[in-house]
C-alpha cells in the first residue's frame, strides 16, 4: 500500500497579525467602546456642524466621497437626461430627494454608560470631547473616582434646571437666552407705545413665558361682543369727524380685539395707507408679538418704507425681536445687518454667521444661499473653504424651490466644483432658476456663480 501523503490541517486559529475584527465594537485602552455606524461621529461630513466643528479639509478626493445622509444620491437611480420635457417639473431632473431638515441627534443614542465613561483615560476620550460640542450642557466625566455620588446629584440638578429653561435657550450655533433678549426688546417698545386706556396691572411680557390668563381671556371675549355691536355705528360716525379721529375711534372700540386690528393694518397696507398701518401695528405689537412673530417684522418693513431717522433706528431692534421669537426671514436680515454693518449694526462676521445658521435651521432659503457663498470662499478666522458643503447648502435651498438657488445648483453641476460634473442636471437647474424668463438678480447667486467659474 502506498504511503499516504499528509495534508496539512488548516490552523484553527489564525495568527494575531491576520485577524480581522468584524465586530463594530473596537478596543480602546482595554475598554470596549460601542461605535454607532449611523452616528454623526462616524461620518466625517456630518451635516450642519457648529462653527467650532468646521475643520480644514486637506484631501479633495476624500471630500468627494464623504457626504451627508441627505446629499445627492445620483448613484442609486440612473435616469436618462437626453430630452427634457416641459410636462415634467424640472426639479425632478435634479434627482435630489425631498427630505425634512435634519436635527441634531439625541445625545443618549450614542453616549456610553457611566461605567464606561468613568473608566476612560483622558487620551482615549477624544470622541467624547467631540461629542460635547453638540450641546453646551453635555455632562463631563469626573476625574475623581470617589466623586460618583456627587456627580450623580449634580447631573440630577442640571436636568431639573434644563427642564425649567425656555426652548429658545437651547438653540444651536451659539445664540442663547432668546427669551431674555425678547423681553428686553419688547419692554422698550411697550414703554414707547403704552396707552392710557391699557390696564396698568397687565404685564405684556407674560405671554412670552406663561399661558394666557383665563380671566383676561373672558374679559377680552366680553369686550369683543360689546365692540361688535357698536362697530357699524362707529364706521358711520367716523366719516363726519376729523381725518385723524377715525383711527382713534377704531382703537378705542377695538381696545383688545387684536386680530381685528391686525386685519385693519393689513387692509391699510394693501390700500397704501402707510400711516394707518403703522399706527395699528404699533398699538397691538406689545400684545401679539409673542404669539405672532411676524408683527415686529411687518412693522420694521413699514418703518423702512416711511424712512424717517427715528424709523431707521428702530428697524434692527424689531428684526432682532422677531428673530428671537423664531421668525426665519428676520433672522436672515439680522445676519445681513451684522455682516455688512447696516441699520446701525457694528460689523461682526461671527455674529452674522450665527444668525445665518439660525435662519437656516428655520428653513430660510436666502440664509442657505448666504452660507453657500461663505463656505465656498471661506471666512478667515471662522470657517475654512469647503466646496462640498457649499454644494449641499445650494442643494437644500434649491429643493425649497428658491429660483436663485436652482440657478446656483445648475452652475455647480456645470463646473463640477463640489460635485460630479453633469451637464444635463446643469441645464435642469438653469431652467428651474429662470422662472417666467426673469433674470437672476440675487447678489449672492451672482457672486457664487462667478466664484465657481474661477474655481473650475
UniProtKB/Swiss-Prot annotation:
<dbReference type="GO" id="GO:0008047">
    <property type="term" value="F:enzyme activator activity"/>
</dbReference>
<feature type="repeat" description="Sel1-like 3">
    <location>
        <begin position="365"/>
        <end position="402"/>
    </location>
</feature>
<feature type="modified residue" description="Phosphoserine">
    <location>
        <position position="227"/>
    </location>
</feature>
<keyword id="KW-0677">Repeat</keyword>
<feature type="region of interest" description="Disordered">
    <location>
        <begin position="38"/>
        <end position="74"/>
    </location>
</feature>
<feature type="repeat" description="Sel1-like 4">
    <location>
        <begin position="403"/>
        <end position="438"/>
    </location>
</feature>
<dbReference type="GO" id="GO:0006031">
    <property type="term" value="P:chitin biosynthetic process"/>
</dbReference>
<feature type="modified residue" description="Phosphoserine">
    <location>
        <position position="230"/>
    </location>
</feature>
<feature type="compositionally biased region" description="Low complexity">
    <location>
        <begin position="140"/>
        <end position="158"/>
    </location>
</feature>
<feature type="region of interest" description="Disordered">
    <location>
        <begin position="1"/>
        <end position="20"/>
    </location>
</feature>
<protein>
    <recommendedName>
        <fullName>Chitin synthase regulatory factor 1</fullName>
    </recommendedName>
</protein>
<feature type="repeat" description="Sel1-like 2">
    <location>
        <begin position="328"/>
        <end position="364"/>
    </location>
</feature>
<dbReference type="GO" id="GO:0031505">
    <property type="term" value="P:fungal-type cell wall organization"/>
</dbReference>
<feature type="repeat" description="Sel1-like 1">
    <location>
        <begin position="293"/>
        <end position="327"/>
    </location>
</feature>
<dbReference type="InterPro" id="IPR011990">
    <property type="entry name" value="TPR-like_helical_dom_sf"/>
</dbReference>
<dbReference type="InterPro" id="IPR051726">
    <property type="entry name" value="Chitin_Synth_Reg"/>
</dbReference>
<feature type="region of interest" description="Disordered">
    <location>
        <begin position="139"/>
        <end position="158"/>
    </location>
</feature>
<dbReference type="GO" id="GO:0005829">
    <property type="term" value="C:cytosol"/>
</dbReference>
<dbReference type="InterPro" id="IPR006597">
    <property type="entry name" value="Sel1-like"/>
</dbReference>
<keyword id="KW-0597">Phosphoprotein</keyword>
<dbReference type="Pfam" id="PF08238">
    <property type="entry name" value="Sel1"/>
</dbReference>
<comment type="function">
    <text>Involved in chitin biosynthesis.</text>
</comment>
Amino acid at each position: 500500500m502506498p504511503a499516504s501523503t499528509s495534508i496539512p490541517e488548516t490552523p484553527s486559529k489564525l495568527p494575531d497579525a491576520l485577524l480581522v475584527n468584524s465586530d463594530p465594537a473596537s478596543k480602546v485602552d482595554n475598554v470596549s467602546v460601542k461605535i454607532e455606524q449611523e452616528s454623526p461621529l462616524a461620518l466625517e461630513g456630518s451635516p450642519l456642524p457648529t462653527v467650532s466643528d468646521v475643520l480644514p479639509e486637506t484631501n479633495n478626493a476624500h471630500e468627494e466621497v464623504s457626504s451627508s445622509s441627505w446629499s445627492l444620491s445620483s448613484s442609486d437611480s440612473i435616469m436618462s437626461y437626453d430630452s427634457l420635457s416641459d410636462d415634467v417639473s424640472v426639479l425632478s431632473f435634479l434627482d435630489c430627494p425631498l427630505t425634512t431638515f435634519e436635527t441634531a441627534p439625541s445625545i443618549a443614542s450614542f453616549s456610553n454608560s457611566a461605567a464606561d465613561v468613568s473608566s476612560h483615560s483622558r487620551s482615549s476620550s477624544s470622541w467624547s470631547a467631540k461629542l460635547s460640542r453638540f450641546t453646551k450642557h453635555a455632562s463631563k466625566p469626573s476625574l475623581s473616582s470617589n466623586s460618583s455620588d456627587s456627580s450623580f446629584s449634580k447631573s440630577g440638578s442640571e436636568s431639573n434646571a434644563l427642564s425649567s429653561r425656555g426652548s429658545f435657550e437651547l438653540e444651536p450655533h451659539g445664540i442663547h437666552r432668546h427669551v431674555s433678549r425678547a423681553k428686553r426688546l419688547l419692554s422698550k417698545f411697550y414703554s414707547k407705545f403704552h396707552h392710557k386706556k391699557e390696564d396698568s396691572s397687565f404685564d405684556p411680557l407674560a405671554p412670552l413665558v406663561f399661558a394666557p390668563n383665563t380671566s383676561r381671556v373672558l374679559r377680552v371675549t366680553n369686550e369683543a361682543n360689546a365692540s361688535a355691536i357698536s362697530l357699524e355705528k362707529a364706521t358711520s360716525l367716523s366719516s363726519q369727524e376729523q381725518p385723524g379721529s377715525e383711527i382713534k375711534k377704531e382703537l378705542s372700540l377695538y381696545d383688545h380685539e387684536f386680530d381685528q386690528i391686525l386685519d385693519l393694518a393689513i387692509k391699510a397696507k394693501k390700500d397704501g395707507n402707510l400711516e394707518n398701518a403703522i399706527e395699528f401695528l404699533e398699538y397691538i405689537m406689545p400684545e401679539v408679538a409673542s404669539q405672532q412673530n411676524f408683527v415686529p417684522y411687518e412693522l420694521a418693513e413699514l418703518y423702512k418704507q416711511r424712512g424717517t431717522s427715528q424709523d431707521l433706528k428702530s428697524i434692527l431692534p424689531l428684526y432682532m425681536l422677531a428673530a428671537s421669537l423664531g421668525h426665519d426671514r428676520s433672522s436672515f436680515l439680522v445676519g445681513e445687518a451684522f455682516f455688512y454693518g447696516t441699520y446701525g449694526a457694528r460689523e461682526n462676521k461671527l455674529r452674522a454667521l450665527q444668525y445665518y445658521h439660525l435662519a437656516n435651521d428655520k428653513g430660510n432659503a436666502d440664509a442657505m444661499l448666504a452660507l453657500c457663498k461663505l463656505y465656498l470662499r471661506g471666512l478667515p478666522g471662522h470657517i475654512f473653504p469647503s466646496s462640498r458643503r457649499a454644494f449641499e447648502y445650494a442643494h437644500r435651498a434649491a429643493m425649497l424651490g428658491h429660483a436663485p438657488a436652482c440657478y446656483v445648483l445648475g452652475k455647480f453641476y456645470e463646473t463640477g466644483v463640489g460635485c460630479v460634473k453633469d451637464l444635463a442636471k446643469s441645464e435642469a437647474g438653469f431652467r428651474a432658476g429662470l422662472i417666467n424668463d426673469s433674470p437672476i438678480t440675487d447678489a449672492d447667486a451672482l457672486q457664487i456663480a462667478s466664484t465657481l467659474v474661477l474655481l473650475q
